[in-house]
């Protein structure tokens, strides 16, 4: 029932683990997303309560428990460091790539196709990026790889115990992301069965063994949370963070039907062309495997397109079937015309040169190394094309991209995430003796790093409307940090309270020009943040 691991699987895992954790100790925890996970896990470790997530001392039902367990375990092993914060995503990224190799190898028996599938997944821009992040999506990717593989294998060999393992992985997904971890794969498999017009396949999707395994995985934690927190958990987790997210956009300004298409095209680089070519070539025969991957990939994108809230990583798991299609595309190129290889080379050069040219607009970093590497890689790849070294071309594309992205991490991501974090003004906050306020925006990285919990100030409706901040009032339920209204801040300023205000450039200018501007003095300003203190 379980896979016997091939020796190459271990090599794939270790290689990509090294790729994904390299340099993580240099990347600070960024705001506004990563810091919420890091702070919640920190409070879990410090409080000793490993079952009910908390943030700012309040119970927090934003996500299920899995990511907090993993981060807390990482902190327990490595300490509360930036490396520890990013280690779970790197670990599960490597596990996902290795499982794709193992799964494709077991299903097809083809070493080249298996290596290509894993290589394409592991070197895709969006996978590399998220494998360095502090979010839930890489753990979800791992769980989804297991669900997709074991469910498909269970349908092929008609073994309910394979399906039971798939349900176990779906349970991990539900502990990671919520009900969507079961609902989405279930819908996609029902669509696949419908396309195959197989009622027996529909019945095979619901074995009693699988349902028992799923309940055994998810019920202990979900049952505990309902028993302990009752309707507060139901309303917060299922209501606000699931139903509201699906029906009312958290970011209305990006709620477009085409939102995930550019993410697919850009996130799949450098393999976008190979994936599209695989789709094109596969359409002629439309084998079972082709139909399966197309339904899993495009079905995922369509599902999240229909949701009200759009977010760059929501359709992330579509990279699993698309990587298999990309491998099919690369293999098909060896029998195609020589010019067809531009399906692979074109998007690769777009990525490399976009990053190379982009360095001329970056205000930081020593970029001559990257520019030289891009030129050398381009010449080498051109030589492979000229001399028809068809095996070397995909290898050069993947390895070259990892080299380019490694330089971007060191020279670009480190300072960029610094600007997205509070680390650039830690010294001012640490040395200030008095209450600290965030006006409008909020950075959970301050309490994470400094054990100082600022008070959030909600701008007036007029100021929010001026900067086109429009979303349902229900989303205010996410703000569980200490907070006050704008008028209360003004009252405290006018009463002479000593305070430090952190805000963005727009709101900083608004405050300086408001009725309380005479009480404020600018302390420091950067491209992102303005610090104001009372006179």
Where are these regions (language model features)?
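Membrane-integral, polyisoprenol-dependent glycosyltransferases
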Residues: 1-340
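Membrane-embedded architecture of ER/inner-membrane glycosylation machinery
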Residues: 164, 278-535
């Amino acid at each position: 029932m379980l896979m016997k691991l091939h020796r190459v699987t271990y090599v794939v895992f270790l290689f990509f683990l090294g790729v994904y954790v390299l340099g993580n100790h240099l990347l600070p925890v960024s705001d506004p997303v990563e810091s919420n996970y890091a702070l919640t896990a920190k409070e879990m470790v410090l409080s000793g309560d490993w079952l009910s997530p908390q943030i700012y001392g309040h119970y927090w039902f934003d996500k299920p428990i899995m990511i907090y367990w993993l981060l807390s375990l990482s902190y327990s092993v490595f300490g509360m460091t930036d490396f520890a914060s990013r280690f779970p995503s790197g670990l599960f990224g490597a596990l996902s790539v290795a499982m794709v190799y193992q799964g494709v190898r077991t299903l097809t028996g083809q070493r080249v196709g298996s290596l290509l599938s894993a290589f394409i997944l592991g070197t895709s821009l969006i996978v590399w990026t998220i494998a360095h992040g502090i979010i839930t999506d890489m753990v979800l990717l791992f769980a989804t790889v297991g669900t997709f593989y074991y469910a498909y294998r269970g349908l092929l060999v008609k073994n309910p115990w394979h399906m039971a393992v798939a349900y176990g992985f779906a349970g991990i997904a539900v502990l990671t992301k919520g009900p969507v971890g079961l609902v989405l794969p279930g819908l996609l498999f029902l669509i696949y069965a419908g396309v195959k017009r197989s009622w027996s396949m529909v019945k095979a999707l619901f074995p009693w063994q699988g349902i028992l395994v799923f309940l055994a995985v998810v019920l202990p934690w979900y049952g505990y949370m309902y028993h302990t927190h009752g309707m507060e958990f139901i309303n917060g987790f299922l209501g606000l963070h699931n139903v509201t997210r699906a029906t009312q956009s958290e970011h209305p300004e990006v709620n477009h039907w085409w939102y995930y298409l550019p993410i697919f095209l850009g996130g799949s680089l450098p393999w976008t062309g190979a994936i599209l070519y695989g789709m094109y070539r596969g359409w002629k025969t439309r084998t079972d495997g082709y139909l399966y991957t197309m339904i899993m990939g495009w079905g995922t994108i369509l599902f999240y397109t229909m949701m009200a809230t759009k977010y760059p990583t929501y359709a992330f798991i579509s990279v699993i079937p698309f990587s298999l299609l990309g491998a099919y595309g690369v293999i098909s190129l060896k029998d195609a015309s020589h010019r067809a290889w531009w399906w692979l080379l074109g998007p690769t050069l777009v990525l490399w040169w976009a990053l190379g040219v982009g360095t001329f607009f970056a205000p930081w970093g020593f970029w001559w190394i990257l520019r030289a590497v891009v030129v050398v890689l381009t010449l080498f790849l051109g030589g492979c094309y000229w001399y028809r070294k068809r095996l070397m071309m995909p290898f050069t594309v993947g390895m070259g991209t990892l080299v380019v992205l490694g330089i971007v991490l060191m020279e670009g991501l480190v300072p960029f995430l610094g600007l997205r974090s509070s680390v650039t003004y830690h010294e001012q906050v640490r040395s200030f003796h008095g209450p600290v306020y965030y006006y409008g925006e909020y950075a959970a990285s301050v309490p994470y790093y400094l054990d100082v919990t600022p008070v959030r100030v909600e701008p007036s409706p007029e100021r929010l409307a001026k900067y086109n901040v429009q979303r349902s009032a229900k989303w205010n339920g996410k703000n569980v940090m200490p907070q006050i209204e704008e008028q209360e801040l003004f009252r405290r300023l006018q009463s002479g309270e000593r305070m430090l205000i952190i805000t963005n450039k727009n709101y900083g200018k608004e405050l300086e020009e408001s009725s309380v501007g005479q009480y404020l003095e600018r302390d420091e300003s950067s491209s992102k943040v303005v610090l104001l203190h009372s006179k």
